[in-house]
């Protein structure tokens, strides 16, 4: 077991335009190879485009999208009796937001023939209205969680692996 200290969570500073930590987290999620200025340009452009099309403030668009596609449970795999079960486990709001951003960006990146700003804006619009790729992933997550609810009692068991006895205690060669 490691003797090091547990890494402390660092606070994300709010973004410049909307003064929101949620937007700052979204920018960090979009950012690749440390190019923050480019990520900010993409996110702000996408939010402005969504704001123009919906006629709703950009922050309300983003919070509406997160309300529509943030999962309440995460599916964790558990092996019991030679069968893998996907068990729904409740998650914190921060983890839920992280998963929602991942779904949103993965579905936006699947769209071809547009710039990143337009792809993200289109995905934001669709997720806000309750359809689109990210919303489909959310619904699929809910369905699988419903079907795995019967096995949710497994989450209280130790999932750290099988218990093994100390081999030096096995006198006589019993394994």
Swiss-Prot record:
Instruction: Supply one GO CC term from the record.
Output: small ribosomal subunit
Q: Where along the sequence do coiled-coil regions lie?
A: none
Pfam families reported for this sequence:
Ribosomal_S7
Supply the PROSITE patterns for this chain. Answer: RIBOSOMAL_S7
- Domain of life of the source: Bacteria
Keywords of this entry: Ribonucleoprotein, Ribosomal protein, RNA-binding, rRNA-binding, tRNA-binding
The GO molecular function terms of this record are:
rRNA binding; structural constituent of ribosome; tRNA binding
Q: Name one GO biological process term.
A: translation
Tell me how this protein assembles: Part of the 30S ribosomal subunit. Contacts proteins S9 and S11.
Q: Which family does it belong to?
A: Belongs to the universal ribosomal protein uS7 family.
Q: What does this protein do?
A: One of the primary rRNA binding proteins, it binds directly to 16S rRNA where it nucleates assembly of the head domain of the 30S subunit. Is located at the subunit interface close to the decoding center, probably blocks exit of the E-site tRNA.
Q: Know the name of this protein?
A: Small ribosomal subunit protein uS7
Which species is the source of this protein?
Neorickettsia sennetsu (strain ATCC VR-367 / Miyayama) (Ehrlichia sennetsu)
Q: Lineage of this protein's species?
A: Bacteria, Pseudomonadati, Pseudomonadota, Alphaproteobacteria, Rickettsiales
